[in-house]
């Protein structure tokens, strides 16, 4: 039905007959001559319909946007002055000899070149939305990335092995999606949050190097970078050290970027310990494009009269930091007020600041309502540690460490991505990858009064920290590593526990008793007793990687049929009710939703 794609018709085909198939992107009637921009996945070509072929011309008169067409004609050069340098086919046009309407279209609900559509409209009419050139580009980029990953891993001796989609519920992380079993009444499968345990058992089975590009499922509240079902590049290896694993997959990401986008990432990614990342940036996924970082002031603020600073400085788990913004004294009071409201989102009670007008004058060269509350030694230490220069502004965070890290880390990004930062060289438009390593093994859950795994409970502690599993879990450092790119964690992995006695100690540190561990993870504990090899791996979020490469606002723009932030598919209207017969077969009875009790009306005078 065609000899070429529309976007591949160029001047090299001048004088040749072509058969094209595609959609009417736009139809124009110019003085009795009809022009149709014919579109397919490769691009557009201009089709000219002259009235000297009456039968064909009559068909052209009835064509409307999104009609599916077949065109037969001759490639000719466009008249002088009518070429379009923005199109690959912009120097030629096709003189139509035969025009067939393969299928008409009702009037589309929107123009495909409308850039102001709501996401609801786009997802409801996803079939049409996917015809848009940007969406075609995004999904083809996704395909190219996946193919480059496969090529690289195949060349490195990895084997693509599928693991089950129906598995056992082990609710240690996000909520599982549960699937009721019809055959085993009252029992449930879970959709996998990752193939973690299966890939570890494949290592025990001797497969040595495994990968798959697979769907994973998590029933969690959604954000711009989350979906209930997402695609993971999942990898595991045996007999490689942590450094060897990182080197292997660092090269994979370099290869993917080079071969799909002609982007050369750093020859060697920098490596930063978790502790350093939190100290300098308040985040374990720092965006290194932003040239701002924290100045630690906790110890220097212990004896000041300003309780906003001295309180957290003397409290266990408190922190005081400054964020120096070079040239920031030019920010208006309105800018500062906006930043103050912004940090309140993250739990900060306010945002102290000092404008540095003239460093040499000390206290007298500073502009701020808080200067009067700080003694000279404290002011001198702030200026010295921060490296403040004339014309700078210093923002301060003082609270519990988590609040300071969250609020000031977010402020760093907010300021760093602003027009002000971009115009003053505080933001570098580049690809900035790094590894973050040496994560804490555990973090303490105050609500449940127990330790929880920072990554997952199958991550190995550093060899020298094994003793802390039973004496002081908070001191344990894990053999875990994240690959971070421009402030996004695109991959995370670890060296795994491969000895049963160590895995059991980790479960006990997590307050998972031997009986519960046996019930939930007995298959793993048994497998580890059969000469399990040292192994480790990593998983990359394909959706996130492609989102970054495409410059998209959301991962929904790189997934063909995504869910909304309410976990709904607006195209198919899923999820949806099912009939009573299906529920009976699954041994399920629905309870009526509990009515919400209305709040009592306020009394009126």
Curated annotation (Swiss-Prot):
Important for tRNA non-discrimination (site feature) positions: 30, 81
Positions annotated to bind L-aspartate: 172, 218, 455, 496
One annotated GO molecular function: aspartate-tRNA ligase activity
Superkingdom of source: Bacteria
Principal cellular location given in the protein's record: cytoplasm
Subcellular location: Cytoplasm
Binding-site positions, ATP: 218-220, 227, 489, 541-544
GO CC entries: cytoplasm
This enzyme's EC code(s): 6.1.1.23
Catalytic activity, as annotated: tRNA(Asx) + L-aspartate + ATP = L-aspartyl-tRNA(Asx) + AMP + diphosphate
Uppermost EC category: ligase
GO biological process: aspartyl-tRNA aminoacylation
Keywords, sorted A to Z: Aminoacyl-tRNA synthetase, ATP-binding, Cytoplasm, Ligase, Nucleotide-binding, Protein biosynthesis
HAMAP family linked: Asp_tRNA_synth_type1
Protein function: Aspartyl-tRNA synthetase with relaxed tRNA specificity since it is able to aspartylate not only its cognate tRNA(Asp) but also tRNA(Asn). Reaction proceeds in two steps: L-aspartate is first activated by ATP to form Asp-AMP and then transferred to the acceptor end of tRNA(Asp/Asn).
Family to which the UniProt record says this protein belongs: Belongs to the class-II aminoacyl-tRNA synthetase family. Type 1 subfamily.
Self-association and partners: Homodimer.
Name of protein: Aspartate--tRNA(Asp/Asn) ligase
Organism annotation: Ralstonia nicotianae (strain ATCC BAA-1114 / GMI1000) (Ralstonia solanacearum)
